[in-house]
């Protein structure tokens, strides 16, 4: 049994620190990506091309889809033939830590499709549960086996200086680690991520089927500086959730004792929902969560990804699209802030941050 990453001197860098590259997975699951994923593949391509301007992109794609992926992307990415059950690289990929000497360590969490038999979204997740270790092996990185502790990358944010953000709704959900107390979960995070403090936000985004991942509601944009998904509509269930998160953040400090600067990032003004036209496009496996017309999707501009040269921000053909771009442009003056039409990723159940996983420099 190897010592914990914390004891070995490793920590999780912030996403805005320099990257070696980004991990992504080609979207092919018929129950996630409607109509053969055609629209999703166009969106993924735009994201990959934008990220690739400033860093390497590793794309997991099985042999059967390789020529298709190459027809979209050519030689812009490093293709790896690693099997997956879906395309959520944030949640199935490794969390890569660094130490003071620049050495890297890949943390391999247990993955059970956001809740296993309790409330998981699909039951065939064996390949997904192996993605982190197989990808680390391909990169020739050592692996810290955190199993059987269940965690997804979208459930944690790090400031790179000892602070981890999580949501109670996700980490304390009965489908993750029901046998562990909150204190035990926190201790596992501190030891596995080389951190000093965990901040527990009460909620994420309303109707987020990951049990409300933190990466959809709050994100670090710098040390002691965050953006928070927000609405002023008191009739929207999101209002009370964001308000509770705001109140907690206002009284909290980071691991260094600093109070947070909090930027409110509006959610889209018009609710994003599944339409009747979307439904025929999905083909489900047994035991897979099914979409319904009128289902509210967890749309949030906070699900952006910070690449070396760009910040990629979801866009929903909404009046708040530009508002979000303007706020984030002020937060990231040294990067190009790029809006990406993202409804076709949202239809899969996540957004830009959910399909990317940074590999620190």
Swiss-Prot record:
InterPro entries per the UniProt record, alphabetical: Agmatine_deiminase, Peptidyl-Arg-deiminase_porph
Cleavable signal peptide: none
Keywords assigned: Hydrolase
Catalytic residues (positions): 354
Gene3D superfamilies: L-arginine/glycine Amidinotransferase, Chain A (3.75.10.10)
Top-level lineage group: Bacteria
Gene Ontology terms: biological process: putrescine biosynthetic process
Enzyme Commission designation: 3.5.3.12
Record flagged with keyword Mitochondrion: no
Reaction(s) catalysed by this chain's protein: agmatine + H2O = N-carbamoylputrescine + NH4(+)
Claim: Hydrolase is one of the keywords in the record: yes
Molecular function GO terms recorded: agmatine deiminase activity; protein-arginine deiminase activity
Record NCBIfam families: agmatine_aguA, PRK13551.1
Family to which this protein belongs: Belongs to the agmatine deiminase family.
Name this protein carries in UniProt: Putative agmatine deiminase
Origin organism lineage: Bacteria, Bacillati, Bacillota, Bacilli, Lactobacillales
Gene, per the UniProt record: aguA
